[in-house]
Curated annotation (Swiss-Prot):
Membrane-traversing stretches: 35-52, 81-103
Subcellular location: Membrane
Assigned GO CC terms: membrane; mitochondrion
Domain of life: Eukaryota
Annotated family: Belongs to the AIM11 family.
Membrane topology annotation: Multi-pass membrane protein
InterPro entries: AIM11 (IPR038814)
Predominant cellular place of this UniProt entry's protein: membrane
Keywords noted in UniProt: Membrane, Transmembrane, Transmembrane helix
Organism: Debaryomyces hansenii (strain ATCC 36239 / CBS 767 / BCRC 21394 / JCM 1990 / NBRC 0083 / IGC 2968)
Protein name: Altered inheritance of mitochondria protein 11
Amino acid sequence: MSAEPSQFNKLLTKYDFKLASASEEYRNRRKRQMMLFMGSAAITIFTSRLAYKSTITRQYVPSLFQGNHAPPLSYNFTSDAAVAVGTGTLLCGSVSSMVIFGTCWIIDVSNFQEFGWKMKSLMGGYEKQKELAKLPMDEESAFLQDSLNDILDGKYDFDETTPAEK
């Protein structure tokens, strides 16, 4: 039983996209990454509109014969500060999530473990680790390593008695 390709697959194949030959699991993974980014972008747009509206509603526009050099007496600085902190936090969180999800979508990362692997490979981690393993070890490091291996093997210094104590 062969599944007939969808209209989307036909379009991808027609324009020679690599995604046309990708597995369904890979497509779902990329779709999830895209939806996370688009969702955070939508939240960013919503919070920026909310911040804009709250700024415009607090704007002081004096009437014709009022001076514009003094703010009105019925002004609550505490609530204004609370709204400013709240909208600033919302904007910072939504923009940060958009940047994080966008970066993860670009470098094809879905969780923290994959992020660690990707960063290690991008920074040459495996090659540098092999180079460090080939270097000779100094005396202090060798002594420390042997001591730790003895402790892990269950060999302790107080188990061995010296000839002077006998």
